[in-house]
């Protein structure tokens, strides 16, 4: 049996198990537990499917499955791309008892989840993350969305999968950059969690990340457990769940300014974490030692901690962030590791000064 651990995400209306597996073995058994599935649709990227097709075919050979390909990259996760996928599902005869399998990274998971949440007013789906970033973040919690011309994840919903199946063996094919991107979210979760988790993250570096290491399952499980606890208490992001946006206000501005071409999401989050911590020093009395330790950890994992993008340009793009209220830019800040605060209004001048200070570190 390839099961390593199952972490439950308990929400008001549903309990979603997150299964951490060493490989794809056991996926078909989990699908078989779902009642009344009439057909299965795999939504994935061709580049991902070509690597794992033989393993998927072997594992899912007993299922009536059809594959729908989408293009890779954040640009493909656009509202304009949904129509062709809806049409394919209609053409293939997908009904309300059909099941969608989202096999890929965060883009595939977000896109396929959004399709599942809206097709026939909602059909079941399963998250099968193939990147470290998706394993610890986007596949867990039920957020699904697509992008609009003027913003990331502007059109979406909260829609829980039937389960998450994370096969760690697929991570072995990830390029170094993808490993590092996932680590940015792990660092974020450890800062929010504090305690032993934060201390553990600080003592490791990029060279420790591989599918055969003992630390990797620990880091993933702790991240999933932390996020599961947050989501369980606030599924719809009306309060506590907002803390998971630590670093993301700056990150989304960076991605938007560069049109998703220069920085990966994880790299943008890494830079955004430092911006948030510098603002935390000013607005929530964070000890500067935490900022220094975070920068050191980012370096150890090969992640950026500053950008050459213009401070004013980034601040301008933050005005369009979906977390804003009444035109006020809202940040998640940190009082100390394990003690985040959210919905903190920050004026553009302070943001510009923080990013400017960040450039000089």
Curated annotation (Swiss-Prot):
UniProt main location, coarse: cytoplasm
Gene Ontology MF term list: 3-dehydroquinate synthase activity; metal ion binding; nucleotide binding
CDD domains: DHQS
Positions contributing to Zn(2+) binding: 185, 248, 265
First and last residue of the signal peptide: none
UniProt keyword list: Amino-acid biosynthesis, Aromatic amino acid biosynthesis, Cobalt, Cytoplasm, Lyase, Metal-binding, NAD, Nucleotide-binding, Zinc
Pathway participation: Metabolic intermediate biosynthesis; chorismate biosynthesis; chorismate from D-erythrose 4-phosphate and phosphoenolpyruvate: step 2/7
Binding site for NAD(+): 106-110, 130-131, 143, 152
Primary role: Catalyzes the conversion of 3-deoxy-D-arabino-heptulosonate 7-phosphate (DAHP) to dehydroquinate (DHQ).
Protein family per UniProt: Belongs to the sugar phosphate cyclases superfamily. Dehydroquinate synthase family.
Entry-linked PANTHER family: 3-DEHYDROQUINATE SYNTHASE, 3-DEHYDROQUINATE SYNTHASE, CHLOROPLASTIC
Name this protein carries in UniProt: 3-dehydroquinate synthase
Species of origin: Leptospira interrogans serogroup Icterohaemorrhagiae serovar Lai (strain 56601)
Encoding gene (name): aroB
């Amino acid at each position: 049996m390839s099961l390593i651990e199952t972490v439950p995400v308990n929400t008001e209306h549903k309990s979603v198990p997150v299964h951490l597996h060493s490989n794809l073995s056991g996926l078909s058994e989990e699908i078989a537990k779902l009642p009344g599935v009439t057909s299965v649709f795999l939504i994935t990227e061709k580049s991902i499917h070509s690597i794992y097709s033989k393993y998927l075919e072997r594992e899912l050979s007993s299922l009536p499955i059809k594959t729908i390909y989408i293009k890779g990259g954040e640009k493909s996760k656009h509202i304009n791309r949904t129509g062709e996928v809806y049409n394919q599902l209609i053409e293939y005869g997908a009904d309300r008892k059909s099941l969608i399998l989202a096999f890929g990274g965060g883009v595939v998971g977000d896109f396929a989840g959004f399709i599942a949440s809206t097709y026939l007013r909602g059909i079941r789906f399963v998250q099968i993350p193939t990147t470290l970033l998706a394993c610890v973040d986007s596949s867990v919690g039920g957020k699904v969305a697509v992008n609009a011309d003027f913003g990331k994840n502007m059109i979406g919903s909260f829609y829980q999968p039937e389960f998450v199946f994370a096969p760690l063996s697929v991570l072995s094919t990830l390029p170094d950059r993808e490993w590092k991107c996932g680590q940015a979210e792990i660092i974020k979760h450890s800062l929010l969690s504090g305690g032993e988790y934060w201390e553990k993250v600080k003592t490791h570096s990029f060279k420790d990340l591989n599918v055969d290491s003992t630390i990797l399952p620990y880091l993933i499980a702790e991240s999933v457990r932390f996020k599961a606890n947050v989501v369980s208490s606030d599924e719809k992001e009306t309060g506590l769940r907002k803390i998971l946006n630590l670093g993301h206000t700056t990150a989304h501005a960076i991605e938007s300014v560069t049109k998703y071409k220069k920085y990966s999401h994880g790299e943008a989050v890494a830079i955004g974490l430092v911006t948030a911590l510098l603002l935390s020093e000013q607005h929530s009395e964070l000890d500067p030692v935490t900022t220094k330790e975070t920068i050191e950890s980012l370096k150890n994992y090969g992640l950026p901690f500053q950008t050459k993008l213009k401070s004013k340009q980034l601040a301008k793009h933050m005005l369009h962030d979906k977390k804003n209220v009444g035109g006020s830019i809202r940040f998640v800040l940190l009082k100390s590791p394990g003690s985040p605060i959210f919905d903190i209004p920050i004026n553009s001048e302070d943001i510009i000064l923080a990013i400017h200070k960040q450039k000089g570190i």
